[in-house]
Amino acid sequence: MASSIVQNGHVNGEAMDLCKKSINVNDPLNWEMAAESLRGSHLDEVKKMVDEFRKPIVKLGGETLTVAQVASIANVDNKSNGVKVELSESARAGVKASSDWVMDSMGKGTDSYGVTTGFGATSHRRTKNGGALQKELIRFLNAGVFGNGTESSHTLPHSATRAAMLVRINTLLQGYSGIRFEILEAITKLINSNITPCLPLRGTITASGDLVPLSYIAGLLTGRPNSKAVGPNGEKLNAEERFRVAGVTSGFFELQPKEGLALVNGTAVGSGMASMVLFESNILAVMSEVLSAIFAEVMNGKPEFTDYLTHKLKHHPGQIEAAAIMEHILDGSSYVKAAQKLHEMDPLQKPKQDRYALRTSPQWLGPQIEVIRAATKMIEREINSVNDNPLIDVSRNKALHGGNFQGTPIGVSMDNTRLALASIGKLMFAQFSELVNDYYNNGLPLNLTAGRNPSLDYGLKGAEIAMASYCSELQFLANPVTNHVQSAEQHNQDVNSLGLISARKTAEAVDILKLMSSTYLVALCQAIDLRHLEENLKNAVKNTVSQVAKKTLAMGANGELHPARFCEKELLQVVEREYLFTYADDPCSSTYPLMQKLRQVLVDHAMKNGESEKNLNSSIFQKIVAFEDELKAVLPKEVESARAVVESGNPAIPNRITECRSYPLYRLVRQEVGTELLTGEKVRSPGEEIDKVFTAFCNGQIIDPLLECLKSWNGAPIPIC
């Protein structure tokens, strides 16, 4: 019994003065530790998570497991090189001490819950056959339903099962559960060999832990005939094959007293899935900040909304960081510089302030980031906790009967995370709706149509409908799970966390937000290319109008200077101010605003020409027909020529996005993923392109370009000058 394990200053198996050694006198309630975990920026934390996710080894000792490491083990199938789990050898002694204590207490006739007693509401029953009791525990908990096959809709995703196995090992390593170290080694070998038990998707209330699903891991370890597992390539394996492939040479385990309870009485399935969900949620939170900044770029937004003073006066750290990240993306942006010139040229062309979806995006996203970050820390505390019952306190020679199996931190953090994800999605939908609406988008075409004939090209209209569907489902999922608790197990489990159910619903929300983010990113790239097309076509229109004005307005019939020559400057101002896509499909149509406003300039000058209008040689009215006829003869050809040059990849004016910090995401979508500008003239549908980007979200390809956008950010807002 001299063996020991250090846990938060408490050496299990070694007598001590608990009052002096087991409590941190400076932080007895752990609030300081919780606050300290939030030090630094959220972005730095996300970068750290990504680094941890990519490490080849996860070393378990019971106290340092992270959300990113759980996600890494869970997603091993998506990696070219599998990450491996190693157990800290220093944990062996403490694990053995608690296991030995159980066997010794059994030998002494000590009455212990789950060792000599029945379970839950039937704990009044007694038995001396501890091994048989554990065997029966696993049998009666195997109450899940799978349907047909190992990949049916009623089977927990194998990634979530791997996460649960890892988290359960981490808990048991702390040496308070009364289980042999050899069983933990066997589970580790199963993980490292990619042998995954099949667990039921439903059937747990995550209090007394995740009893039903965890019993199927125990069933595999004990060789139950109904247990199922799949191998590295998804193949079904029988009981003997599982252990042989994993290199477990000891054969199936005969559970000792308490070991069955140690395997099933914990929150690992809920907290494992929550870890996976939160890894992706943190990435999506940063993505929403960057996408909001790109939205500001393509909408000719005013960057004033990111000014540090505004957010400093509001005090919320999530808001301050969100604004600072957007400010960093927009600082020096070529789009912002161009928009500033536009606003200076015609300050009344758009509202003084941008709409809420842009202007208040830091205020909207900030609280969601704080919620997701707090939930991440709560789950990290949970996956490093001892969360079963009873707890074996070797140092005080007693079993403690409590309720650490209550997974309330999981249910609450997942409900909160899901609400935050729904709020992010709502903002994304609001921004998307502005982007595709030509009443709001500052000159982009309706539906972001890029074809020559808008009557035969409806752009992203279908995608907008899909976004409404995604957003509606996401808002529905924002409803809490934890207020639907039912009293269970003869009213013994009369309050329960529903942690896994909430985690599952949050995983659904993550998938939907990835669909929304993919659709939105494709739309933003469409808008970027439309701004590029707009700039090139407008340049062609300006040059053509200038040339036609010089040719038809500058000289009179006898070679003398004509008063109409003074119209050129205002004609070019019309071109500059008029949204190109209001006339680009037929630039000389008399029903479109370009020709109407060009004519109005000439008419206004003619009205001011006074007596000179009576002279045919100096009349501006007489020049209107010649100007319009010449423009109709050359402008459509010049516009089409400019469009063809852009489509060929050799535009007169390069794409501004290459000069922006947001370029890495555009590069990913257009070059690495291989999408292109969507038009009705092509066969490819929006869904095909969005699918490519969605795949990049799902396989993690999106992460590096996202972080590259922010690689030069120093973690602080631009100082107030």
UniProtKB/Swiss-Prot annotation:
Keywords: Cytoplasm, Lyase, Phenylalanine catabolism, Phenylpropanoid metabolism
Alphabetized Pfam families for the sequence: Lyase_aromatic (PF00221)
A Gene Ontology BP annotation from the UniProt entry: L-phenylalanine catabolic process
Crosslink (5-imidazolinone (Ala-Gly)) position: A207-G209
Domain of life: Eukaryota
NCBIfam families, A to Z: phe_am_lyase
Protein name: Phenylalanine ammonia-lyase
Species of origin: Solanum lycopersicum (Tomato)
